[in-house]
Amino acid sequence: MPSRREFLEFSAAALAGAVARKAEAAPETADGEWRNRQPGMSYRRLGRTGYLISEVGMGGNLIAPDRHEHVLLAVDMGLNYFDTAPVYGEGKSEQGYALVVKARGRDRVFLNSKVSLWDLNRNRLYQEIFDSLPAPEQKRLRHAVRERMESSGALETDYIADYFKDQRAELEAATLSDVMAERYGGRIDRGKHYRQLILDSVDGSLRRLGTDYLDLLMCPHGANTPTEVKHPEIAEAFERLRKAGKVRHFGVSAHTNPAGILETAIDLGHYAAAMIAVNIINHRYLGKALDRARQAEVGVIAMKAARPVHPGDGRYEPSPARVRKIQEAVPGPLKVPLKAYAWVLRDARVAAVISEMGDAALVRENLGLAAPRPRG
């Protein structure tokens, strides 16, 4: 049995090996917007935003005013991309980041928030209409929803990957809204519930973050269907926010059907970035979309890189076959989440991976993957 020193040396060697196999980072002379550049961190260009973001970004779900000190350490180590949303801790995530920005400086980080209530509000409105309909019409709509979900391919086991308990229910709710919009869309005040909701959400985020602009805004937050992304009111709100100087670039996030949603975002033209589920389990479904994103300069940030192969908070237990897949792809003593992040960072079409880092130990561990590749 190896000694502790031997194990640490073996682990360090494994980490160095993982770093060596990453895709090429942006060179020091790369054009674009640099923030918080540190010699121990690698950066990649986020599509046509021009932002040079750290290869590992800070997930915001665990951040709060009383839980943000480790984020200060991450900034000191070169991390420069913060992800958050109003729904994280009911605004506490944004408030926690505000303390970091105040301590380290707004010009050192890229801030991304989202419009968390957009799709939830839309689904609520259509569910209320659905509940008022006669039983035969409800039956027809349910049948149409099932057909559309099955034909979309979004339910394939390795594609949907089941990252959280209500993922399939969210897809069903979004699909019901899509189907109902074709006949009952006129009952919705789209200006109020689609466009104005976005404007109000951004004002709230700016207030909680203590800033007057976002570098990136994602809407919808957790899109489930391509139809959700196509609403013209989203583009109209984006343009108002851009002209007001409140948001610089726009994106979308998606756990479910990430390829379909990414391709739709590319086709629409007003999206400069997307944060989608990318991992060793769903990767085979994403090739065409990732290629198109690179050609269109739509920056891709990977989330849920580790969720299919690691229990995380304990609410998900990955299958042995999935764990074995990442162990074989990235051999050695690294922890499974690190292997999952390292594997995704091999893909040059991905700008960064998002990691939920809840303490200083995880910051040091995970940011080690973003170290520059060895020369030669």
Report each predicted region and the residues it spans.
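N-terminal binding-site loop/beta-alpha segment at the start of enzyme catalytic domains
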Residues: P2-L171
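Structured C-terminal cap/extension of enzyme domains
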Residues: L8, A14-G17, N80, L99-V101, ...
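Generic structural signal for well-ordered alpha-helices
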Residues: Y43, V71, E94, A98, ...
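Conserved, mostly hydrophobic/aromatic
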Residues: L46, M58, F82, Y97, ...
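Active-site mouth loops of central-metabolism enzymes
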Residues: V56-D66, Y184-L197, I326-G332
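Short catalytic-loop micro-motif centered on adjacent basic/acidic residues
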Residues: G57, Y81-Y88, R248-V252, A273-I276, ...
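Active-site beta-loop-alpha junctions enriched in small/polar residues
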Residues: N61, V87, K114-W118, C219-G222, ...
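Glycine/proline-rich, positively charged
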Residues: A135-A273, R284, K288, R346
